[in-house]
Amino acid sequence: MAVVDFMEVIRRTETGPFIEERDFDIEVIFKTIRGLVEKYGIEYSRDKLITADPEMADAAFQAGLELAEEAGIFCVDTSRQIQFSREELLYGLKAAPRELRIGSGKDQRVLRASVYGQTCRPFIWAGFSGAPMTEQTFRQTIRSYIKEPLVDALGHGSLHVVDGIGVRTGSPLEVRATRQELMYVREALWREGRPGMPYVAAESSTTALGDLATMHPDFMPAGNFHFVPTLNELKVDYQRLTKTMAAYEYGIYNINLVDAIIGGYAGGPEGAAVVTIAAFILGLIVHRASVSLCHPAHNKWVSTSPPESIWAENLVGQAFARNSPIITIGDVWTSAGTGTKDILNEITAITITKSLTGNHPHGVGATNGKFSHGSGLDARCMAEVAHAVYNRGLSLEEGNEIVCELVGRYEDKFSDPDIGKPYHEVYDVESALPREWWLEIYRDFKGEMRREFGLQL
């Protein structure tokens, strides 16, 4: 047996069962997920944000697999369900890559799937993820992430203004913006002496225009990555399928970006976890995904630092690590901004969870990408926390205790987070190095983590 051919996926966008989108949302997504959560006894606990219950992780995986089989994925352009048999879904899981050798020269790295019970060196994917920036801010900030020695791969947001003109969806500027983005990425990698570092890019275009415009060795050499989002919940359109086909045939890796909404049609954190598992399974076939990215988005706060988001991602990671390991990464998105202690607490709580439950950290998306208040020191914290967890051999129970404590220090601030400072106030722009006052805050934080929790950052 082989993985379902992509042309067969396209065929099923035309021949699958017809259903109105509203009916898919309510009858298929909402009602099915609610029933599966009850059937499998999946239950959120604020006191167990990192669950040590393997049976719940296994139950969540089975619920997600059942949802993937029953719902399939809805094609917005044709109002058809693209459905797959249980056998097709399981073979897609079996055929998924367990490791990728990416980058070149001294910057080559191996990105591996996490297997339950086995230690796996963390893979650090860093940059000001999700942030729309001006050209000047993009070029200034990107160097601060590349300079960090623990960073393995780059993912650095998008340009929303080019030559002083705003980039509109579907406009010719999506082509120009995405090419400019790639030019700045490659320029910065050469400047900082890491030309072979792998990266995810082409983020400056919401349609397929930008991706198509950069699939050339001068912009996006084969072997790098771009995002192909699964639309909420379990949906796809021709734009996403175009991205998939072009990248698959050209030779860059697709990352299936899934941002299930906690408080949306999937329900609470339990349903968000189940629909994310289903989306990951379906994305292996529909998006030809080599990597799957988890971002359970809180419907009010967006970031991945609320306790409900942390719990959902913990369950997704453990479900795959135990039942069918695939390469998964997870967004480190904070409500607070750079230059604050709050962002360090959020980064640490999210990163501990990811490191213990099978999701390599990707970030930091400071201020949820609303403001250009991010810096390379945010990524340093993320990387050093991940390596501290790995080096110490932290248990799930120990990690849960730390994470629950840290979440308690910031969870009452989501309605009015400290957005911190813009990049030029926390970093010297010319040297791309952190200012002393920001370094001092981080040094104090590291000492606090060592004294309170025994984490050697």
Question: What is the predicted role of each segment?
Answer:
Residues 1-214, 230-236, 372, 404-408, ...:
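Metallocofactor- and cofactor-centric catalytic cores in central/energy metabolism, strongly enriched
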Residues 55, 62-63, 67-69, 267-269, ...:
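Secondary-structure junction/capping motif
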Residues 53, 85, 267-269, 375, ...:
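Helix N-terminus capping/helix-initiation residues
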Residues 124-356, 360, 369-372, 380-387:
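Helix-rich catalytic cores of soluble enzyme domains
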Residues 350-361, 367-457:
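Gly/Ser/Thr/Ala-enriched C-terminal appendages of enzymes
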